Amino acid sequence: MRQALPLVTRQGDRIAIVSGLRTPFARQATAFHGIPAVDLGKMVVGELLARSEIPADAIEQLVFGQVVQMPKAPNIAREIVLGTGMNVHTDAYSVSRACATSFQAVANVAESLMAGTIRAGIAGGADSSSVLPIGVSKALARVLVDVNKARTTRQRLTLFSRLRLRDLLPVPPAVAEYSTGLRMGDTAEQMAKTYGITREQQDALAHRSHQRAAQAWAEGKLAEEVMTTYVPPYKNPFAEDNNIRGASTLADYAKLRPAFDRKHGSVTAANSTPLTDGAAAVILMTESRAKELGLHPLGYLRSYAFTAIDVWQDMLLGPAWSTPLALERAGLTMADLTLFDMHEAFAAQTLANLQLLGSERFAREVLGRAQATGEVDDAKFNVLGGSIAYGHPFAATGARMITQTLHELRRRGGGFGLVTACAAGGLGAAMVLEAE
């Protein structure tokens, strides 16, 4: 094992995560229908600051992400600063790493803290699958550019006459990988077939996710980290995730047909994460700054790792690659962890990564490591459920996982937790967290 890389400032301060918050997550076109991601981001950051009682000028940087970006607000981070009453001089910029976007935002703020350029910052992400940038066809887009340069009405009419009726149809955002044309569900089907993951195993994991999430809400474990929201016409509160199946039964999952490979597939809408709207954010600062402000951190960022693999086959294996690297940098092994939380993009993807984490052959032949990362103890794995139940607003999921894991570590008396996610483009992310 290589030497651990301590995540500390020049003065030896640890990177503290002092608080975290998210909106409830809503299925597409339900509670947050018509609410853009930038407004969801403003909601969560404004409430996070209000609850923390941190002086507004204490936050020196905001790094925020959005995967499905809107042309009207390309820098969501800056819009959040301007729309929440934060100091107008607060540095703010946006990031995107697909489903690992808020992992990246957290890492960026942590790096600023370690560099000594700031002492406190906010990281997070928001996405809306209900407010989408509906585009136009390539043919219409080209004509519109040319029309803008045309000098006469006749020239403009000539340009428009080249269009066919189909060229006028709206174009929704792409759901496939740009480089391969494969949808995420197609990749999940690849992984199910490659690693021999059955439909029954996938449905069982989805059922488990919903059961755990429903239990977490019933026991009040999420109340502190999920805000109550009000949206126009501001009559009814929305306070709990609305995708969770409170009365989940395995028999219900078996009724659904495959969603991607309709003849021979096993990936369904029920064992996949749904399109979701929501936002989440965390406040990070140096350990000494937290003490100055009289704050008691939720926990600390011990290490992080980002990885990338090929996109043509089984590209959602990011956790199997990034987890051993994050553990190594933290100076820990799988056995040292109290909790292990993995983003459930699909049940097939989750089960494939779990399988490879325990595989000696994968470790030796693919990762070039002497031994497997380690089997994940079911008693430590996604103990409060995962994205299949909660939903997945792309840029917000990482911040949800970090906040949720730190709260659960504290309930258990402290320890180490690892959070990890796959992402489009063959990317992977993992972070080791510590709570006392």
Curated annotation (Swiss-Prot):
GO terms for biological process: fatty acid beta-oxidation. The gene is fadI. The active site is at C99 (acyl-thioester intermediate), H392 (proton acceptor), C422 (proton acceptor). CDD domains: thiolase. It catalyses: an acyl-CoA + acetyl-CoA = a 3-oxoacyl-CoA + CoA. The lineage of its organism: Bacteria, Pseudomonadati, Pseudomonadota, Gammaproteobacteria, Enterobacterales. Keywords: Acyltransferase, Cytoplasm, Fatty acid metabolism, Lipid degradation, Lipid metabolism, Transferase. It is found in: Cytoplasm. This is 3-ketoacyl-CoA thiolase. HAMAP family: FadI. PANTHER family: ACETYL-COA ACETYLTRANSFERASE, CYTOSOLIC, ACETYL-COA C-ACYLTRANSFERASE. Catalyzes the final step of fatty acid oxidation in which acetyl-CoA is released and the CoA ester of a fatty acid two carbons shorter is formed. Coiled coil: none annotated. Its main location: cytoplasm. Pathway: Lipid metabolism; fatty acid beta-oxidation. GO terms for molecular function: acetyl-CoA C-acyltransferase activity. Pfam families: Thiolase_C, Thiolase_N. It is an enzyme of class 2 (transferase). Belongs to the thiolase-like superfamily. Thiolase family. Its EC number is 2.3.1.16. Heterotetramer of two alpha chains (FadJ) and two beta chains (FadI).
